[in-house]
From Swiss-Prot:
<feature type="region of interest" description="Leucine-zipper">
    <location>
        <begin position="52"/>
        <end position="73"/>
    </location>
</feature>
<keyword id="KW-0804">Transcription</keyword>
<feature type="compositionally biased region" description="Pro residues">
    <location>
        <begin position="88"/>
        <end position="100"/>
    </location>
</feature>
<dbReference type="InterPro" id="IPR046347">
    <property type="entry name" value="bZIP_sf"/>
</dbReference>
<dbReference type="GO" id="GO:0050829">
    <property type="term" value="P:defense response to Gram-negative bacterium"/>
</dbReference>
<comment type="subunit">
    <text>Interacts with transcription factor zip-11.</text>
</comment>
<feature type="region of interest" description="Disordered">
    <location>
        <begin position="1"/>
        <end position="60"/>
    </location>
</feature>
<dbReference type="GO" id="GO:0045087">
    <property type="term" value="P:innate immune response"/>
</dbReference>
<feature type="compositionally biased region" description="Basic and acidic residues">
    <location>
        <begin position="39"/>
        <end position="60"/>
    </location>
</feature>
<keyword id="KW-0175">Coiled coil</keyword>
<keyword id="KW-0399">Innate immunity</keyword>
<dbReference type="GO" id="GO:0006351">
    <property type="term" value="P:DNA-templated transcription"/>
</dbReference>
<dbReference type="GO" id="GO:0005634">
    <property type="term" value="C:nucleus"/>
</dbReference>
<dbReference type="InterPro" id="IPR004827">
    <property type="entry name" value="bZIP"/>
</dbReference>
<dbReference type="Pfam" id="PF07716">
    <property type="entry name" value="bZIP_2"/>
</dbReference>
<dbReference type="GO" id="GO:0006357">
    <property type="term" value="P:regulation of transcription by RNA polymerase II"/>
</dbReference>
<feature type="region of interest" description="Disordered">
    <location>
        <begin position="79"/>
        <end position="100"/>
    </location>
</feature>
Length: 100
């Protein structure tokens, strides 16, 4: 008798399909979250690059301005040393540093 019993295979197959569907859905959601996170990180990195480029440009302008000021002060010092500190006319004031 037990050899003639037919097993109902439709139920386990439906369960397997439901499990597969559920796993696929969860995997797709995880993939979408990962891709979204990656896009956000790329955007954040691009913004940081832009910010650092602007900061670098500002610092380069400041370095240029300070180099000009240093050159001017060296010239003043050399003129003063050449004059041996004799009472001569006072040196001109340094250029304004309000450009930065």
């Amino acid at each position: 008798m037990s050899g003639n019993r037919k097993r109902n295979t439709s139920e386990p197959r439906e369960d397997d399909e439901d499990d597969y569907s559920t796993k696929r859905k969860r995997n797709n959601e995880a993939v979408n979250r990962t891709r979204q996170k990656k896009r956000q990180e790329e955007n954040d990195t691009a913004e940081k690059v832009d910010e650092l480029k602007k900061e670098n440009e500002t610092l380069e302008r400041k370095v240029e301005q300070l180099q000009k000021e240093l050159s001017f002060l060296k010239e003043m010092f050399m003129a003063y040393a050449k004059n041996d500190g004799n009472d001569g006319p006072p040196p001109p004031p340094p250029p304004s540093s309000s450009a930065v």
